[in-house]
From Swiss-Prot:
The gene is OXR1. Residues 63-271 form the TLDc domain. This is Oxidation resistance protein 1. PROSITE patterns: TLDC. PANTHER family: MUSTARD, ISOFORM V, NUCLEOLAR PROTEIN 7/ESTROGEN RECEPTOR COACTIVATOR-RELATED. Residues 15-41 are annotated as: Disordered. It holds the Pfam family TLD. The keyword Mitochondrion applies. GO terms for biological process: protein retention in Golgi apparatus; protein-containing complex disassembly; response to oxidative stress. Its main location: mitochondrion. Belongs to the OXR1 family. It comes from Candida glabrata (strain ATCC 2001 / BCRC 20586 / JCM 3761 / NBRC 0622 / NRRL Y-65 / CBS 138). Residues 23-32 have a biased composition (Basic and acidic residues).
Length: 271
């Protein structure tokens, strides 16, 4: 059994020993920054067991989230949330249909849970861009103007590293004797391709305003400022908008630009 208390203590030790521990996480923009923030990414990864994803139907073909992506997102979550090893799919556009009402309905039971958990929104656009948000609470509608969420929320986007680039880097490292060829063999399968890798670009809460989350029966949104939403999805979960905002200091998240078509959308409970 995974020792939660022991892992929590080790995590705290890792963070306290970091040479960069006095840096403000609101300025972190990439997984490279995060590796500096935690002092040693290797020591972090050795502390936590891998994530198990629960809830995909055997018939679900277009799965948006992979365990490797979870490993990129975990460092930005609150320490106790990082310790959860099971992420549960609460809503999937492919499995449950394209409806914001259905999304809210699937998350309704979580509104009364006493446990402290987290929620990850994952979106895929027409150009295969993957992006989304982390929330400290389940998304639920407010018919009157009311923002929710707290400073744990953040926006993110993720890029897969092309296999040919990874393979070229592996060959370069081998030529320079920087890696052990035997250790690297399991990265390459029999077909000669390399397992997919992911690069995270994260946008934590800046403190500029408190417009973390705003949901109604007509739309779901995160982040705002100067008349724009950081991430906005319509009630049919077909169209979306993304803009830079003061709340998260984010860039445009979608590969399509400020307006995008939703090809896939999932909401996961962490814990």
């Amino acid at each position: 059994m995974f020792n939660v208390k022991g892992a929590l203590n080790r995590l705290r030790t890792t963070w306290s020993n970091s040479e960069e521990s006095d840096r403000d996480p609101r300025h972190l923009k990439s997984s490279d920054d995060l590796s500096n923030y935690t002092g040693s990414r290797m020591s972090y990864e050795e502390t936590l067991p891998p994530v198990t994803l629960l809830g995909y139907s055997p018939k679900t073909k277009n799965r948006l989230l992979h365990p490797e992506m979870c490993d990129e997102l975990r460092p930005l979550m609150p320490t106790r949330i990082q310790l959860y090893t099971e992420w549960t799919l609460l809503y999937s556009l492919e499995q449950h249909g394209a409806s914001l009402h259905s999304l809210y309905d699937k998350l309704r039971e979580d509104a009364s849970t006493p446990r402290r958990v987290g929620y990850v929104l994952v979106i895929k656009d027409r150009k295969d861009g993957i992006f989304g948000a982390y929330s400290n609470e389940p998304f639920h509608p407010h018919e009157h103007m009311r923002y929710s969420g707290n400073g744990e929320c953040f926006l993110w986007k993720m890029e897969s590293v092309p296999n040919k680039i990874l393979r070229a880097k592996i060959r370069e490292d081998k030529d320079e004797d920087l890696i052990d060829v035997n250790d690297d063999e399991d990265k390459i399968n029999n077909s000669g391709t390399v397992n997919e890798s992911w690069k995270l670009c994260a946008y934590p809460y800046t403190g500029a305003n408190d417009f973390m989350i705003y949901c109604t029966s007509k739309f779901l949104s995160l982040g705002a400022g100067e008349g724009h939403y950081g991430l906005w999805c319509d009630d049919g979960l077909m169209k979306g908008v993304t803009n830079p905002t003061q709340t998260y200091g984010n860039d445009v998240l979608s590969r399509e630009g400020r307006k995008f078509t939703i090809m896939g959308l999932e909401v996961w409970r962490v814990g």
